[in-house]
C-alpha cells in the first residue's frame, strides 16, 4: 500500500485550500491556518486520513470488487482516465450521466448498444448499409464511447467510488449515498466533508495535487490485486503439496 508523506504533499501543493470567504465551516477541523485570505490545509491530518482511506481501498481491492474513479473537471479528467485504466478500474472522466448508478441496467443497455455497433463494423453489416447510415452509427458510437467508455466493462455496481471534487460531482455522490456505496474523496475547503465516507482533505484544483492522490489510489489497488494473486497461487501450491503428501502416505 502507498503511504503519503507530508513533504511530498507540500511539493504538490496539496495544502492550498480555497479563499477563506468561500469555505465550508464543516472543514474547520482540517484547516491549519489562514494565510493571505487563503485557507491552508493541515497536512498532518491529510496524511493520516489519506493513509486510512488507502488501507480501506486496499481491503476492497483484495476482494476483487471494483472501485470507480470519478473526476470530470478539466484538471482531473486525463489523470482519472490514465490511472483508472492503469489499475484496470472503471471511471467517469467526461460527464456524469444521471442514473449511472441508480439506473444501472438502463446504462448497461446503452453500453450493449455501443458494443452492437462495434460488431456491425466487423460482421459485415456495414457493407449492407448506406454511407450515410455508417456515418450516423459512427457518430452515435463516438458519443456513447466518450461518455460510457470508462465503464464499458463494468458488469455490476462498484464497491466504492473515489472522487475528485465532490462539489462538481454532486450527482455521483448523491447516487452513491442513495445506494449505500461508500465514497472516498479529495475534499477541498469549500466542500462539505459529511457527504463522503472517507475524507481526504486536499487541494482538488491543482494538477500535481490531483496526480499525487489519484496515483496513490491506483498504486494501492494494483498492489492489492497483485498480492491477492500471489496469495491464491501460494494457496494452490499448498493444496497440491498436501495432495502429494496424501498420495505418498497411501502408497
Swiss-Prot record:
GO CC terms in record: cytosolic small ribosomal subunit
GO BP terms in the entry: translation
Pfam families: Ribosomal_S2
Any GO molecular function: structural constituent of ribosome
Presence of keyword Ribonucleoprotein: yes
Matches recorded under Gene3D superfamilies: Glucose-6-phosphate isomerase like protein, domain 1, Helix hairpin bin
Stored InterPro entries: Ribosomal_uS2, Ribosomal_uS2_bac/mit/plastid, Ribosomal_uS2_CS, Ribosomal_uS2_flav_dom_sf
Name of this chain's protein: Small ribosomal subunit protein uS2
